[in-house]
């Protein structure tokens, strides 16, 4: 399957079947497979019960598996075909059908013998040298106590839920029977790697995701589960969990039992690992052991999902290399797999599952798999795909979606009534169930709720009143994600997304970048020193969404280092690290890596939402030197770069270091290049309800060519603060605040740029009384010291002169 050899084999079979080849030509085909004993080719289509003792035949889901048990090069080969075709079949007359040859057959024919086969399923015995920890059932991602069902709030059916439960899902519990219905579906596990005899199991869900760099298949049941990880840059590997009562056998050598990794584990299931061990690298063996340890550590959902986020964070903080990517990708996907296994297992043991866990599970699957595709294995994020079958019956999944739709429609009419936490619940539900992508006005409603939250948090951000806590960070992530999840060709979708990008850039100030880097450093320490439970969104920042690319410039690192004294966790960590400044540099590098890796690649975001920038730019210059992109209107964008090369109205920024030059280009089709002139002016006060500055951006830069912030003026309230000057309550707009430095430009949506003189003149004239008093006292002291010094020198000169005169007189005598 997917190999050239299989194509050749299928063509030969198809030609043979199409001609309805007579009996006497059959041996020529069988001789190709090395089959001399014709009866050994068994086409038994009995039911499962009727052939339970015969592992040479299976019928599952309208498919018959045909096993070749002859002593031949094809020994142990498994074929499978539609049962309807098999039922019409006689041994000597086969109808035209799609007969699929297993990878085993093709590999076997290509390699010639089992001994030289490059993909052996055996692995050196694994034995733990440490004691297996017990389940850490008390571990949670937050400080809240887990809610439990009570007599007045028992587990219920999904049909009894109400829209209010979407904004308060933690206290609603669903019966486990709602996951599967009255009867659990039994299916046949056909090993994607074609190594194992098919296994019958109670199936709950299948998840397939990947990109052009990798593909992962997860199959999860009640007593059986498997994950197959395939990559372009590494051999595939498969992890299987099976109840102890079930034996796992290899297809070849014929029906040979496949030994579990460790028979003596205390877990209720056995662990099987399939992967190459001949010439396996240390990284391969290390990843195998880590995968096994992730199974043995705990069967608690909270622990496993916390470890998934921790490993994803470590992956993001790890320097890019093929070896690191392969290892980390396997570790993260295995942890995600184990969290799903734990969720299903716990639900069937307890008889219920919380409504919140159902929604969080779907959101985690999407967020984690999509994040992996953003930076792992040199993948193109545009090739990411996710095929996730829910662990709910279709009609029950529709009930949940209907609840979410009603909640969104109601919330869009009055977003002010929702708290940050309720925004989080609603937007996470919409994201998890792809509500933004549904037809009708639902996408517009979700975008409306998301944008209102972004506007509210932006207002708090510029006023320095925002609490960057867990709820705010998570809610903001899902708000942006829900907007970008909406198809861009829908009415108003692209305009909303461009506005969201402006808000993200406005919140990504110089101070916020520094604060976020320090928060990331603290999380890294928590994971590595304390092994505390974390969530990757605990360090989410608008800078991840913003089209600001100067995050890793050196001045941010210097500011972060100077603020370390305000973070005791980091300070203590560095004090205990003998590497000194190298340890601090390492933490800074990891923080920058996390932000950079979590960002959607610039060209992908621009291609979708700011195509005029891509059209009017040299791609190499854009990716190499762009510092900031502001899609300021529906048709045009500002691009700030270090080099010329963007076609549009080009402004050469004066007053900056010649070695760190800034160019601002207003880009709009048809990409006509002209020279712009930045005009200095005093902003006139608008009359009445006019809002001439609404939609503008206040950009501030320093004389060394560094961008400080880009504040989006989105409302009349912010316009009033802008023109209030020294009376403004927003420090970004108040020239009298001492720490404000640099030049301020106002960028208009039509491509006009002006330099605001108020900031420059105020910076010269506004001097604090404390500064004047200190300077005067210092000058007085300096003058006094100078006078005393001069007097001492004069006295010393006089004294020496008199001594000289006395000596002269003595010589004369």
UniProtKB/Swiss-Prot annotation:
The gene is gH. Belongs to the herpesviridae glycoprotein H family. GO terms for cellular component: host cell endosome membrane; host cell plasma membrane; membrane; viral envelope; virion membrane. Glycans are attached at residues 62, 116, 247, 279, 410, 434, 469, 576, 727, 750. Pfam families: Herpes_glycoH_C (PF17488), Herpes_glycop_H (PF02489). It comes from the Viruses. Residues 791-813 are intravirion. The heterodimer glycoprotein H-glycoprotein L is required for the fusion of viral and plasma membranes leading to virus entry into the host cell. Following initial binding to host receptor, membrane fusion is mediated by the fusion machinery composed of gB and the heterodimer gH/gL. May also be involved in the fusion between the virion envelope and the outer nuclear membrane during virion morphogenesis. Residues 19-769 are virion surface. The keyword Membrane applies. Residues 135-159 are annotated as: Disordered. Coiled coil: none annotated. It is a single-pass type I membrane protein. The chain crosses the membrane at residues 770-790. Interacts with glycoprotein L (gL); this interaction is necessary for the correct processing and cell surface expression of gH. The heterodimer gH/gL seems to interact with gB trimers during fusion. Keywords: Fusion of virus membrane with host cell membrane, Fusion of virus membrane with host membrane, Glycoprotein, Host cell membrane, Host endosome, Host membrane, Membrane, Sialic acid, Signal, Transmembrane, Transmembrane helix, Viral envelope protein, Viral penetration into host cytoplasm, Virion, Virus entry into host cell. It comes from Gallid herpesvirus 2 (strain RB-1b). Residues 137-147 have a biased composition (Basic and acidic residues). HAMAP family: HSV_GH. N-glycosylated, O-glycosylated, and sialylated. This is Envelope glycoprotein H.
